[in-house]
Design a protein with these regions (language model features):
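Helical "lid/coupling" subdomains associated with nucleotide-phosphate turnover
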Residues: 1-202
C-alpha cells in the first residue's frame, strides 16, 4: 500500500512544537507488508485476527478468515467469486488503508514537564488536507470505494494520528493519475481538465 502526500504538514493548532527531521513537501511511503495478496497475512497480523473480524461480515469466523488469507497469499491471482469473499477482500483493504495512513501521517503527543503540559508534533499534520484520491485494483473494482477510503481519515478514537479530517474523496478508476501528473509539468490546464473529467467523487 503506497501513500503519497503533497503538503507542508505544519501544525494546524497553536502551541504545538515540531520535533524530528523535516518532512518533505512531497512525501511517499511504501508499506510492503500491507497488501491484498502476498502480504495479506501481514495485514491480519498487524491488527490481530480478532480485531480483523470487525472489518468482515459477522458470519465469518477467525478460522475461515485465516484460511482465506492464507489461500490468497499463495494464489495471488485469485479473484473472489462470491459476495462474502469480496467482503473479506474489502475488509483487508480497509485495514491496509487505515494502517498505511497511520504510518504516513504525523502524530501529536502531550509531554508533561515542570511547567505543565506541552504538545509535540512528529511528522506531517495532514488534518486540513482537503482531498484524498484512491487508486488501485481493489478500489477500482469495489462496489463502495468510498467506504474503504474513509478508513484512512481522522479517527476521534485515535486523536494523536494526524490524518485528514474532512477530505473530499475521489477515485482514479482508470489508473490515469500518474499520466495527469506527468502532463501537469508541460500542460497544467489540460492536466486539470483531465483530472476533473476522470477523477470521480465517492
Amino acid at each position: 500500500t503506497d501513500i503519497d502526500s503533497i503538503a507542508k504538514g505544519a501544525p494546524t493548532k497553536g502551541g504545538v512544537t515540531v520535533r524530528g527531521l523535516e518532512e518533505p513537501y512531497v512525501k511517499r511511503t511504501v508499506e510492503g507488508d500491507l497488501g491484498m495478496r502476498y502480504s495479506a497475512p501481514s495485514v491480519v497480523e498487524a491488527i490481530g485476527p480478532k480485531n480483523m473480524l470487525n472489518y468482515v461480515p459477522k458470519e465469518i469466523g477467525e478460522k475461515e478468515l485465516i484460511n482465506y488469507v492464507d489461500k490468497i497469499s499463495d494464489d495471488v491471482k485469485y479473484v473472489p467469486n462470491n459476495k462474502k469473499k469480496k467482503q473479506i477482500d474489502y475488509g483487508i483493504a480497509k485495514v491496509a488503508t487505515k494502517l498505511a495512513i497511520k504510518r504516513h501521517v504525523g502524530r501529536i503527543e502531550t509531554v508533561y514537564g515542570p511547567f505543565g503540559a506541552s504538545h509535540v508534533q512528529y511528522g506531517k499534520d495532514l488534518t486540513k488536507l482537503d482531498m484524498m484520491i484512491g487508486t488501485g485494483g481493489v478500489l477500482a473494482h469495489s462496489d463502495n470505494p468510498g467506504e474503504i477510503l474513509r478508513h484512512g481519515i481522522y479517527d476521534s478514537n485515535s486523536p494523536e494520528v494526524l490524518a485528514p479530517v474532512e477530505p473530499e474523496l475521489l477515485l482514479d478508476k482508470e489508473y490515469i493519475l500518474s499520466c495527469i501528473g506527468l502532463l501537469s509539468e508541460i500542460a497544467p490546464d489540460k492536466a486539470l481538465t483531465l483530472a476533473k473529467k476522470h477523477l470521480k467523487k465517492v
